[in-house]
Amino acid sequence: MKIQSLLPVLLLCAASANAADNIRIEYMPAETTHDKLAEQSIQSSDLNPIFVRLSQAYFPFRKPLTLIYGGEDGPMYDPDTHTIHIPYTFYLESLNYFSNNQYEDRYGKSPKTGALDTLLHTLLHEAGHAYIVDQSIPVLGKEEDAVDNFATILLIDYLDDGADMAISAADMFAFESDDRPDYYDFGEYIDEHSFDLQRYFSTLCLVYGSDPEQYKSLLDEVEKDYLRDRKDFCQYNYENIRTNWQHYLQHNDPKNSEKPSSSPNAMTN
């Protein structure tokens, strides 16, 4: 049995207002026309209900989490207030990247779809930080990489079409990388985040590893000398990361659990 993609209106309202007393969702006043567009696009999508249902099913918080849209900070998680901040500008910038890169012409997905897919991946990334704090999960290595994996594994394993949504998020990393100069400042080499292009390939690696047959051409950008080795690694890496995160997720076996339906694409345009 699969959870239906478009939830009843009453349930949508309840999820946004109460989030089952586990996640509180707030919208700061949208001050510009563009901010109002972003607010409307987010509110009219299935994104927040999907996020809430995933949390309820797989990573429930002991302490209620607050998600705030708007403002200037973020995307970020503030551990002092147990709050995720997502500015409207993040959605708008993502929308511009997907539009400017002719996403619909190249891949058959609208810029809005790409931007909302990216936003869901980002919400799950920030929720990963929150879950680590909430559950006192030890992290060996870069926490930013760990929560990138958290977000991607949740999409792949627990959402219909989630792998396709993860690919959209990966493409956003590639667009941001293309928009950078050809060099990095020294300080960026000790930044908490991996480089955008690394995040792009790491995300694609997990998607490929989850189903090598379906995504057999996904890593074709990799040079032929490395391709077979990388494909083997990605299959191992997906299983390893998935197994590690399942120690901390509820309903550990995704193959025998319900999937909340996908996509923030079942959205009002």
Enumerate the language-model features and the residues they cover.
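Active-site recognition of the HExxH zinc-binding catalytic motif
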Residues: 86, 121-134, 144, 148-152
